[in-house]
């Protein structure tokens, strides 16, 4: 039996044709119009790619610096025992700069008042101990996203400017944030173009046939709006 749509969902469905693909600007406008949350919803792109995710070289994961930012004030925690790196991270406006002992104490207290952890590579043995806590929360640092780095201050600067992560799920779909509903459509379009260009460049050499099969944009809890794919 088909799931009954709520009144909000019915109103939203009336605003667009679920079977039609729109140009990028119009699709983003529709994603904003179909957002019915009371908070400033995120706007995300989802790429359905022709990938065999069982193969390591076809698992896309990384980060992209969005030219217009993410629209979000990201709280960054840096963990390092190096006094010079601590000083540089503080100057880069990291919200928390902790040594290993203070970091472990924070995790033991389940104090997660931050969004991202940036770690000095020397801290990885410490972080590994807390993988079961950090992993499910999406907080485990990773070299591919630039959050395990010998220059944490640079990572802090990029995160504060507007760095977004992307990764492939088990179905070969790559998801990434491009901003917030409150941002101007033109800014979201520019961010989307930057991300689309990057994903195209990352096409694995082994992929045959159509690489980008489908592309949608949506707000938090909103419907996916199809975007026309350039030939």
Curated annotation (Swiss-Prot):
Role summary: Binds directly to 23S rRNA. The L1 stalk is quite mobile in the ribosome, and is involved in E site tRNA release. Protein L1 is also a translational repressor protein, it controls the translation of the L11 operon by binding to its mRNA.
Protein name per the record: Large ribosomal subunit protein uL1
GO cellular component: large ribosomal subunit
Entry keywords, A to Z: Repressor, Ribonucleoprotein, Ribosomal protein, RNA-binding, rRNA-binding, Translation regulation, tRNA-binding
GO process annotations (BP): regulation of translation; translation
Similarity comment text for this entry: Belongs to the universal ribosomal protein uL1 family.
Subunit structure as annotated in this protein's UniProt entry: Part of the 50S ribosomal subunit.
Domain of life of the organism encoding this protein: Bacteria
Molecular-function annotations in GO: rRNA binding; structural constituent of ribosome; tRNA binding
Record Pfam families: Ribosomal_L1
